[in-house]
Amino acid sequence: GFYTPETYPSMNLVWSDEFNDSELNTDLWNYDLADGCAVGLCGWGNNELEYYRQDTTNIKLKNGKLVITATLDGGTYYSGRINTKNNFTITFGRIDIRARLPKGQGIWPALWLLGSNIDQNPWPACGEIDLMEMRGQEPDRVQGTVHYSNGGYVTNTGFYVLDQSDFTEQYHVFSLVWDQNKISWYVDNENYKNFSNSGIAGWPFNNP
């Protein structure tokens, strides 16, 4: 498979986490906790059934990997979710994430970017870039998506489908290349979607 280099032409590495510590580096990451109701977003805006917690049953580091596991305990689904809010922002560049994905009905692995001004400029006006999402019942297909506001909610999605395989079988590299004019999505360095700024009035993607 594709292994990401530390640098690309005209780019320098500015942030990385190889998960080689014994526990998650909270200078880089925050834990999302509970069901979202405390922040007025029950179900985290997606009708999610699980309860996020900071527990090694659900989220831990092992052998240089971040391992997130969904569990069912006493009738409650638990899982883990982390973010970099107030710890790191980026405007333009390339993001690579190497991951092996789970499958199963109701499973929804995802890697998202949200506008850092979301507290002042609520979603979707702040903009959202979904670097990768996969529906657990379709483990051979991932998607890249943007969400934004242009006189109303707008979304645009592209798909990448594996041939005679699925994303649970081995690690793949999911990438986003982003500049002021275009956003591009890749799987194992193969480009499968581009989204261009064609004078969109509500284009929020020139901000961190």
Where are these regions (language model features)?
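GH16 jelly-roll
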Residues: G1-P208
